Structure formats: C-alpha cells, structure tokens
C-alpha cells in the first residue's frame, strides 16, 4: 500500500525539530566580545552589529536546518580529534584546568577558542602545534585543495594566525584539517605563522572596539545593498536604512 502521507510527516517532524532548535538557540547568552573566528570577515560594520548583539532583521535568524549544520560541524570536529589520536597524535582539546584552549585580549572584549593543541605524534611534524578543523561542503573542499587555506578561506586563515599568536604556538606550523561533509574526505595543510596577518587582525579588533566605545558607525563594505556580502548579512535592512 502506498503511503501518501510521507511528505507531510517529514515536513511536520522537520518543523517540530526546527522550532525546538530555534527556541534553544534563542536561550543561549549573547557574545559580549569580538571572536577570532569572525575577525577575518570583510565588513567592519557587520562586526559592530555582532559585538552589540544587534537584533537581526525579521526572518534573518538561523533556521533549524542551519543550526543542524553547525551541530554537525561540532560532531565532525570530535570525530577528527578521535581519528588523529588513533593515528598517534597526542592531541589535547583541554588545558590542565579542563578548559578549552583560548585567549582573551583588550580586557576580555576580544577572545578566541582553539580546537586543540598537538604536543607529540608521528615524525615529520614539529611539536607543539595548533590544530584547527572545519567541516566543509564539496565546493569549499575543492577550493582548499586548489588554492590552499590563505587564498581560499581568509577568514579561517585569520583565525589560525590569531590563535598561533595569542597561544604562543607561532614557532611551528599549525595543522589545519578539513573534512568534506559529503564524502568524509580529509584535507590537511601545514600553516606557517603569518605575523602580519595576526597583527592586522589584532589592530582591526582594537579599531572596531574604539569605534564602538565612541558610538562611531564604521563604513559599509559596499555602496550598494546588492553587494554579495550585504545580501547574506542578517543586518542588511537595518544597515541600509541608516543615512550612511
């Protein structure tokens, strides 16, 4: 007997899960700092909106499907950590106090939390080294293979450089890994410390915070709301409703 209700049931269950995840996300405390994971983004005004926890435009919150993608990324990170340990890497995800490796700067208003530190392991690597992992789609995975990290994903590269600088792990290349979520292929790259990139990102954070302290609204990235960065920004309407 054919089941003509499968689509309706899938939609119903999916909606229930979406709403539950969105409610849970709404209860999370807002960040009161600039995160290292976002300091490589193009638009400084967007980072100001993030820092102030400015309400997003109507309908621009993260839907349940996107929240599940984020959750998948955390699970994939745990799996990759287990696989690296299985391969002989002494990977530490927590420090001696049981806390995630991280740093704070500018009176706690700039922070970052690294995936881990590898302190020993197979030959051919220099220890200790920072470890950072991402779960990515096929297109991003291909771009990483073709262009490498700095050219294909500058936001990730900035994050790595900041962790190397502030965690004192700049002497040895970091190990950046990415897992293709579609076929679980692994990409790995040694990332040399980019001192200039880390310094520019730190200076940028200070400039953004100074502007926030003086109520200065930093310039938009573009002169038109149809710019690609603006189209995907959750504060697009708010930003472009302002006089400048």
Task: Please report, for each region that a protein language model flagged, where it lies by residue.
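Generic beta-sheet signal
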Residues: 94, 133, 177-179
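Residues immediately flanking
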Residues: 133-135, 235
């Amino acid at each position: 007997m054919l089941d003509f209700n499968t689509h309706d049931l899938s939609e119903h269950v999916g909606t229930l899960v979406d709403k539950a995840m969105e409610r849970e996300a709404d209860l999370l405390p807002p960040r009161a700092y600039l995160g290292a994971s976002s300091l490589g983004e193009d638009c400084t005004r967007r980072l100001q909106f993030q820092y102030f926890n400015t309400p997003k435009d109507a309908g621009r919150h993260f839907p349940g499907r996107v929240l599940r993608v984020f959750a998948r990324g955390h699970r994939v990170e745990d799996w990759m950590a287990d696989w690296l340990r299985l391969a002989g890497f002494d990977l530490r995800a927590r420090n001696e106090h049981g806390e995630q490796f991280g740093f704070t700067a500018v009176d706690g208003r700039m922070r970052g939390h690294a995936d881990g530190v590898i302190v020993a392991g197979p030959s051919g690597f220099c220890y200790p080294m920072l470890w950072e992992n991402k779960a990515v789609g096929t297109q991003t995975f291909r771009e990483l293979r073709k262009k490498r990290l700095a050219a294909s994903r500058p936001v990730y590269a900035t994050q790595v450089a900041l962790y190397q600088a502030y965690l004192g792990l700049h002497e040895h290349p970091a190990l950046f890994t990415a897992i293709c979520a579609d076929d679980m292929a692994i990409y790995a790259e040694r990332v040399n410390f980019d001192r200039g990139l880390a310094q520019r990102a730190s200076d940028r954070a200070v400039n953004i915070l100074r502007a926030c302290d003086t109520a200065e609204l930093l310039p938009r990235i573009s002169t038109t709301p149809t710019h690609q960065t603006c189209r995907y920004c959750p504060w697009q309407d708010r930003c472009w409703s302002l006089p400048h």
